UniProtKB/Swiss-Prot annotation:
GO BP terms, alphabetized: regulation of transcription by RNA polymerase II; skeletal muscle cell differentiation
Protein name: Zinc finger protein 689
Annotated function: May be involved in transcriptional regulation.
GO cellular component: cytoplasm; nucleus
Biased composition (Basic residues): 128-137
Keyword tags: DNA-binding, Isopeptide bond, Metal-binding, Nucleus, Repeat, Transcription, Transcription regulation, Ubl conjugation, Zinc, Zinc-finger
Record bears the keyword Transcription: yes
């Protein structure tokens, strides 16, 4: 037996021998073989530093392949990375996924063109030039300016419902990430994650100055301007300054008066589509924001934030005059009128003025005689819901809050707090004119009528006005007051005869 012409090489199991590679040229290395791709969800989870590192590595890799002569045509991924944008684009997909996406977009555009031809037949539009040329653009301009259904997302107006549905399909392709709670759609998953915090109540961003928490970083940045006092946005018409650009934009509509977005249900007009969308919830009854503590639902996120402070006990707005704290800025503004004496709400019947609109509405019930709060137990009616709540405690006899000093019990903690000032001698409400102090705000309000001369309780029969409600009641019960029979006192005829 002849010896072999060449020595046999020992091979490890699974190793390809040199005879198998003979006659084959190695395949050239491509950028797609070494590149790393991200879906929109994966890209949204990357931190800014990770995205910067990814851009540098991919560019360096493509440059090395070019030095080896293996670069080929510039990939769509490199073109996207060279723009240094943080917004995800389909170019970041795997090449096979990217080709499928391009095919899907091409079919979608073809379907939309066919639908537009059905909605807007081009028979009345003149054609010029070559055969098969598309109709001219004035037809599409009329599509946006004519009246009809309104898109709740962008505020555009369409001639009919099919055109609106076609527009919504295009919007859904641009914003493929819907919110499972309210249906609002977003272009990127990071925006959806940030939006869902409005429903869950999650607030990961904390203010260093006051400890207030926010669901978005930009809201924290806007809030921190409150501590610095900076108002960088100036109105060019009146010079007024604002902390937010959105507040300036809303303010400028007071100068122009422009409100192009109309509610199809009631005809009310708004300056922005977002305000129109919030308003339409009053017609639909939609309340997309839910409190996780008590399951109460709200139409606006700001209302949910203010409500949640009831559970947390947070009161971030202190009064600089008496150090009392409030859960919302509107309640602080209303409270400060107690110290300033400002009363912007006037009664059109008796010229009495009030610091709060709710107090004016309650006062006007004296003129109308309306008592809209009836007791379901005895049928007695009251002008105020608070008076009804206090009255109902007489039926249930449930008084859970006891005074530590005298043992007297109360149905509500506010009544207990007011009563305890009798023992402590605390008088937190001071008159600005004579410095006299009172334990209850209602006593201060009655005292201030002596300085202003105001008499907010009118007699409906003779027109005479009184400073206090009980003075009006005594006036009505006096004999021959209105040239008629005297009205009985509250205690009945026996008490009245004994008093005489």
């Amino acid at each position: 037996m002849a010896p072999p012409s060449a020595p046999l090489l020992e091979q490890a199991p699974g190793e390809v021998g040199p005879t198998r590679r003979r006659g084959r040229r190695p395949r050239a290395l491509k950028f797609a073989d070494v590149a790393v791709y991200f879906s929109s969800e994966e890209w949204g989870r990357l931190r800014p530093a990770q995205r910067t590192l990814y851009r540098d590595v991919m560019r360096e890799t493509y440059g090395l392949l070019g030095a080896l002569g293996c670069a080929g045509p510039k990939p769509a991924l490199i073109t996207w990375l060279e723009r240094n944008t943080d917004d995800w684009e389909p170019a970041a997909l795997d090449p096979q996924e990217y080709r499928r996406w391009v095919t899907f977009q091409r079919k979608t555009r073809t379907r939309q063109k066919n639908e537009e031809k059905e909605v807007f037949p081009p028979k009345d539009v003149p054609r010029k030039g070559k055969r098969g040329r598309k109709p001219s653009k004035p037809r599409l301009i009329a599509r946006q300016t004519s009246g009809g259904p309104i898109c709740p997302d962008c505020g555009c107006t369409f001639p009919d419902l099919p055109a609106l549905e076609s527009h919504k399909c295009a919007q859904n392709l641009k914003k493929p990430y819907p919110c499972p709670d309210c249906g609002r759609r977003f272009s990127y998953p990071s925006l959806l994650v940030s939006h869902r915090r409005a429903h869950s109540g999650e607030c990961p961003y904390v203010c260093d100055q006051c400890g207030k928490r926010f669901s978005q970083r930009k809201n924290l940045s806007q809030h921190q301007v409150i501590h610095t006092g900076e108002k960088p946005y100036h109105c060019p018409d009146c010079g007024r300054c604002f902390r937010r650009s959105r507040s300036l934009a809303n303010h400028r509509t007071t100068h122009t008066g422009e409100k192009p977005h109309q509610c199809p249900s009631c005809g009310r007009r708004f300056a922005y589509p977002s305000l129109l969308a919030i308003h339409q919830r009053t017609h639909t009854g939609e309340k997309p924001y839910t409190c996780l503590e008590c399951s109460r639902r709200f139409r606006q996120r700001t209302a949910l934030v203010i409500h949640q402070r009831i559970h947390t006990g947070e009161k971030p707005y202190p009064c600089p005059d008496c150090e009392r704290r409030f859960s919302s800025s509107s309640r602080l503004v209303s409270h400060r009128r107690v110290h300033s004496g400002e009363r912007p709400y006037a009664c059109e019947h008796c010229e009495a003025r009030f610091s709060q609109r709710s107090t004016l509405l309650q006062h006007q019930l004296l003129h109308t005689g309306e008592k809209p709060y009836p007791c379901p137990d005895c049928g007695r009616a009251f002008r105020r819901s608070g008076s009804l709540a206090i009255h109902r405690s007489t039926h249930t006899e449930e008084k859970l809050h006891a005074c530590d000093d005298c043992g007297r019990r109360f149905a509500y903690p506010s009544l207990l707090a007011s009563h305890r000032r009798v023992h402590s001698g605390e008088r937190p409400y001071a008159c600005d004119l004579c410095s006299k102090r009172f334990a209850q705000w209602s006593h201060l309000a009655q005292h201030q009528l002596l300085h202003t001369g105001e008499k907010p309780f009118p007699c409906l029969e003779c027109g005479r006005c009184f400073r206090q409600r009980w003075s009006l009641a005594v006036h009505k019960c006096c004999p021959n007051t209105h040239n008629g029979s005297p009205r009985p006192l509250i205690g009945g005829p026996n008490q009245r005869s004994s008093a005489l």
